């Protein structure tokens, strides 16, 4: 759902499975008792008529985000009721929440870091040796929904042979990065 009124009481149906995106966002930016300081999460909304819309959440700038799906859904609802900015332009809608037109390829073009494309049918992510100059700030992950992404950009890696929900993948990736587990890039 890229524009219109987001039904907060029916995010799993009337909002085109916005509940899945909200859980992924929450897994990306929230810890047990706070907000991660080193995460940018960009969701790409393709639902409905019209072009794709991007909403970017910058964790160290966020204010008023709470660990409750409807509250986070309300932040998204406030963005999508606004007119969409042109492709390639970001408009700050509230602290740490940016709105812009664009698609996955445009987003990846903006990132200046190695990109890992999560795909259950690829080599495992968590084996190998970390590069000596590895930094969390210098890696990006992309994932889709219940099927592989159409984009072939990024290094394909797997978290296992089963297709997992996006928010679970994000939690696993955070664990691997937080614990310094060796990644196969």
Outline where the language-model segments fall.
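Post-transcriptional modification and biogenesis factors for structured RNAs
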Residues: 1-185
